[in-house]
Amino acid sequence: MNLLLGHNQFIGISHISEKRSREREKKFSDVKNIYKIVEKAADLGFEGMIIETHPRMLRFLDYYKKNQTFDIEFYLQVPYVQGYIQKMNEKGLYGLISEIIFRAGLKTASALAIKNLINLICKDYLSMVKSALYLEVKPFKDIKIKTILLHNVITDLALSLQMKEIFIEYIQYVETKMKLKPGFITLNFDLFKNCFKKWNIESPTIMTPINLKGYDMNP
């Protein structure tokens, strides 16, 4: 069994206590503190870590690449849903896409190119998924990505709408174009399992909550 280190605490998330959330936010605003925890976890036998394209995690990875006193594999969760929603509210779709492109290192993208991309997104949501996925993963090309995990917001929405093609396209794109292992995060494991069996899709890597209290589990 592989031990994986979660990342929520490093971006100030606690599902139990707002006070704890504030404490974590303050402590881990300095990425050196994240590095120390991950370094200790690797020393204790943790072989992998969940990350996402949160700005703080990107800063941590920059620090990791410069120092790298330990070796660990990363499981990349995409997309950064909270950040997408915030950018959409602040700057609209144009601002959101501009931010993704800039973060991917394509700083010279023209307004016309962005407008064309928006038009494409409106016409073809599968192209949107692939384009966003490519741009989300691009900043991580220099580190060991074990698996690309599709965020549960996207996974569970696609499951509820029975959008089989989303899963097939995602798996094929990650495997053939990105040469990485695809995976999914879901809070609806039973529905996920039944849908993949019905669609005859081979079970990939799955991350889902399993606990005695049924927290974040459906049903």
Spans of model-derived segments:
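Active-site mouth loops of central-metabolism enzymes
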Residues: 16-33, 113-132, 160
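Acidic-and-aromatic substrate-binding clefts and catalytic sites of carbohydrate-active enzymes
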Residues: 48-60, 81-84, 156-158, 190-192, ...
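Hydrophobic faces of well-ordered beta-strands that scaffold small-molecule active sites
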Residues: 1-7, 49-51, 72-77, 148-150, ...
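Hydrophobic alpha-helical segments and helix pairs
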Residues: 94-156
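Short, acidic/polar
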Residues: 25-42, 128-140, 189-194
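N-terminal binding-site loop/beta-alpha segment at the start of enzyme catalytic domains
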Residues: 1-69
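Beta/alpha (TIM)-barrel catalytic core signal, keyed to glycine-rich beta->alpha loops juxtaposed to Asp/Glu
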Residues: 142, 146, 153-219
